Amino acid sequence: MKHKVGILGGTFDPPHLAHLHMAEEAKAQLGLEKILFLPNKVPPHKQISGMASNEERVEMLQLMIEDRDSFEIDTRELMRTGKSYTYDTMRDMISEQPNTDFYFIIGGDMVEYLPKWYHIDDLVKMVTFVGVNRPLYQKEVPYDIVKINMPETAISSTEIRNDIEHAEAFLPEKVWSYIKEHQLYGKK
């Protein structure tokens, strides 16, 4: 019997409650054994803010998931030089864990970008994409995507960074404390 592992990639700059809820909902609704959080170094589709270092983002992720045994962090993309593509990461993971079915979790806002992903036609054969339904993002794409529902959470890392003084409610308590202690995102 194959293992079922979810993967949630992102910049996690900072990791927030919506990331946590997405992972929890995907795990529960799809019966996944564990969730791997996959922090990106240089996502090809985004400009990096550079606000928190790789180490700080990983530390915040660790704080967010430390009480959840079935949640782990995979830092392989942070170790790569240059751009890091999901295709390369998944090729490596499948080679390392051939007895595992991978479920790549994306927010509803990312579904419309799938056709632009590097080697997407190969990637959709390697993983099952899981789209988290969000009312504002109902874009259809020519790929099979498992959809899961979760309550609307209007949270984004960009908004949190831009208004850090009012972001406490959107962050796990330990992540908020870390941001204050390390004076990230202008928080003094």
Curated annotation (Swiss-Prot):
Pathway: Cofactor biosynthesis; NAD(+) biosynthesis; deamido-NAD(+) from nicotinate D-ribonucleotide: step 1/1
Source superkingdom: Bacteria
Catalysis performed (reactions): nicotinate beta-D-ribonucleotide + ATP + H(+) = deamido-NAD(+) + diphosphate
One biological process term in Gene Ontology: NAD biosynthetic process
Keyword line: ATP-binding, NAD, Nucleotide-binding, Nucleotidyltransferase, Pyridine nucleotide biosynthesis, Transferase
UniProt xrefs under Pfam families: CTP_transf_like
Keyword Transferase: yes
Gene Ontology molecular-function annotations: ATP binding; nicotinate-nucleotide adenylyltransferase activity
Keyword match Chaperone: no
CDD domains recorded: NMNAT
Enzyme Commission number(s): 2.7.7.18
Assigned protein family: Belongs to the NadD family.
Function: Catalyzes the reversible adenylation of nicotinate mononucleotide (NaMN) to nicotinic acid adenine dinucleotide (NaAD).
Protein name per its UniProtKB record: Probable nicotinate-nucleotide adenylyltransferase
Species of origin: Listeria innocua serovar 6a (strain ATCC BAA-680 / CLIP 11262)
